[in-house]
A protein has these predicted regions:
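Helix-boundary/low-complexity linker signature
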Residues: 1-178
Length: 178
């Protein structure tokens, strides 16, 4: 169970574990060997301040915009504490996360400490859906302004398309008609 307190309450979907590969019965994170093969890319992305969890903030910085944010307090009263429960759009990585520049994580937001974290604050865009739409429009209109962001985002997108969301052939066949 999580208790969520927001400065300006709005609908918010929180996620803990995010799987990359579907085995047919469960989602799993990318294996260590695959991540190790991508060390240079992930280190470069993280060094540039590009994390999937903070893409909106990175795009906003790339366009030299100041986004409006709010603080969300998460109290983990009985859920698994191995991961930080966070929305898809963070303005900054929480201090309680074990994710660092040299981390080989791409989609996870592991909690720091042996037993994880039970309470933490997140900074999120005030209106993430509106912010995302505005940023996409601005990136289309003035791509030269955000070259560094677009380079990082393109590299990450290629990595995701190559590695993430792999489905077994049976699942792919079932989804094909959709």
């Amino acid at each position: 169970c999580l208790t969520v307190t927001m400065e300006q309450p709005t609908a918010l979907y929180l996620r803990g574990f995010t799987g990359d590969t579907f085995t047919g019965t469960a989602w799993q994170a990318l294996d260590a060997q695959t991540l190790a093969e991508q060390t240079d890319l992930l280190y470069w992305l993280h060094k540039e301040g590009f994390y999937p969890q903070t893409q909106l903030a990175a795009a906003s910085r790339g366009l030299h915009r100041q986004e409006q944010t709010q603080t969300v307090l998460i109290e983990n009263t009985s859920a698994c504490s191995a991961y930080v429960y966070a929305p898809y759009a963070l303005s900054a990585l929480p201090q309680e996360s074990a994710l660092r520049t040299d981390s080989l994580e791409s989609t996870q937001l592991p909690a720091s400490g042996l037993r994880g974290v039970r309470q933490y604050r997140l900074t999120i865009p005030l209106a993430p859906e509106q912010t995302a739409a505005e940023l996409l429009d601005a990136l289309r209109e003035q791509p030269e302004t955000a070259d560094a962001y677009l380079s990082a985002e393109g590299s990450y997108r290629a990595f995701v398309q190559e590695q993430d969301v792999k489905l077994p052939e049976q699942a792919r066949a079932q989804l094909a008609p959709i």
